[in-house]
Amino acid sequence: MEFPFDVDALFPERITVLDQHLRPPARRPGTTTPARVDLQQQIMTIIDELGKASAKAQHLPAPITSASRMQSNRHVMYILKDTSARPAGKGAIVGFLKVGYKKLFVLDDREAHNEVEPLCILDFYIHESLQRHGHGRELFQHMLQKERVEPHQLAIDRPSQKLLKFLNKHYNLETTVPQVNNFVIFEGFFAHQHPPARKLPPKRAEGDIKPYSSSDREFLKVAVEPPWPLNRAPRRATPPAHPPPRSSSLGNSPERGPLRPFVPEQELLRSLRLCPPHPTARLLLATDPGGSPAQRRRTR
Ligand SMILES: CC(=O)SCCNC(=O)CCNC(=O)[C@H](O)C(C)(C)COP(=O)(O)OP(=O)(O)OC[C@H]1O[C@@H](n2cnc3c(N)ncnc32)[C@H](O)[C@@H]1OP(=O)(O)O
C-alpha cells in the first residue's frame, strides 16, 4: 500500500507501534524532519487508508479502524512496512494489527458468566497482494511478545474465516468456548487469567459500567440501538408486518433488528436477571416511579 509521502522515513522500524497519541516515531539521524503536525497528519492518513482497506477486505459497511477512533480509544496498532519493495523510494505499508483491552462478560465451559478484561484482537489486515506470505504471523508474533500474552489468552472480535484458519495454523487454536456475544475465545482461556486478563479495579459506580461485552463492530449495525436483550420487540396483540428477527442461540451473536420500543417492564426485569446490568436499563428503572429499590438490586 503506497502513499504520496515517504513512509520509509516516517516509520524507521519494520514494525511501528502506535497508541492513541499517534506520535510520530523518532526519525533516523540525518533525515530531514518535517513539522510534527505534518508527520501526524501522514500517520492519520495511513491509519484511515488501512482501516478502509481492512473494512473492504472483510465486507464491512464502514471501517472499524480510523485515526479518530484510535484517538478516542486506548487501542494499540502494530503497523508493518515493506522493507523490500520501495516504489519511488517512498516505501509501502504491508498491513496492521489492532488490539485493545476490553471488559467482557464471557461464558466458561459450564456456561457461567465471568467478568474479565482480556487483550482483544480488534482488527487485522494484510494487503491482498501479500497475504499468505507470513506477514500476518510476523505482526502477530511481534504483538504477542510486546503485550506478553499467549494466543489462548486472547479474545477475538468476530473473527473472519481467514483469521480462524490463521489462528488454527500458527497457534493450534481450534476449540472455541461458545459465547453469546461476538467475541471468540479458545480452550485454555480460563486456565491462565493473570496475565493478560487485567485485574479489574474495585467495583465501579454503576454509571461507569459499559454495555454487555460491546464489540468494536457494534456501531456498524444500529448506532443508537440498546444492546440485547433490551432491543427485543414488545409482545404485540396483532402479528407484526415483518417476521421477527432470528432468535439467538448459545455461541451465536444475538441477531439485532432495527431500533424498537423498549420491552414492557415485567419482561425487561425478567431479562435483566439473566444478564449484567446496562446503564439504559438503570435509567429506565430510575425514572420509573413504580420501580422499588429491591427490584433494582435484582439487576446487579
Ligand atoms: C478480528 C479481526 O480482525 S477479523 C478480520 C481478519 N482480517 C481479514 O479477514 C482480512 C483479510 N485477511 C487478511 O488480511 C490476512 O489473510 C490475515 C490478516 C487474516 C492473515 O495474514 P497473512 O499474512 O495472510 O497470514 P500468514 O501468511 O502469516 O498465514 C497464512 C495462513 O493464514 C490463513 N489464511 C490466510 N489467507 C487465507 C485465505 N485466503 N484463505 C484461507 N486461509 C487463509 C491460512 O491458515 C494460511 O495458511 P496456508 O496458506 O498454509 O493455508
Curated annotation (Swiss-Prot):
Q: Where, subcellularly, is it found?
A: Cytoplasm; Membrane, Clathrin-coated pit; Cell junction, Focal adhesion; Cell projection, Axon
Q: Tell me if Acyltransferase is a UniProt keyword of this record.
A: yes
N6-acetyllysine occurs at: K56, K146, K210, K221
Q: Show the GO MF annotations.
A: L-lysine N-acetyltransferase activity, acting on acetyl phosphate as donor; tubulin N-acetyltransferase activity
The domain of life is Eukaryota
A GO cellular component annotation here is: axon
Enumerate the residue ranges of region (Disordered): 229-263, 280-300
What biological processes does GO assign it?
Answer: alpha-tubulin acetylation; microtubule cytoskeleton organization; neuron development; regulation of microtubule cytoskeleton organization
| Keyword RNA-binding on entry | no
> Its function?
Specifically acetylates 'Lys-40' in alpha-tubulin on the lumenal side of microtubules. Promotes microtubule destabilization and accelerates microtubule dynamics; this activity may be independent of acetylation activity. Acetylates alpha-tubulin with a slow enzymatic rate, due to a catalytic site that is not optimized for acetyl transfer. Enters the microtubule through each end and diffuses quickly throughout the lumen of microtubules.
Protein name, entry field: Alpha-tubulin N-acetyltransferase 1
Q: Which species is listed as the source?
A: Sus scrofa (Pig)
Q: Which gene encodes it?
A: ATAT1
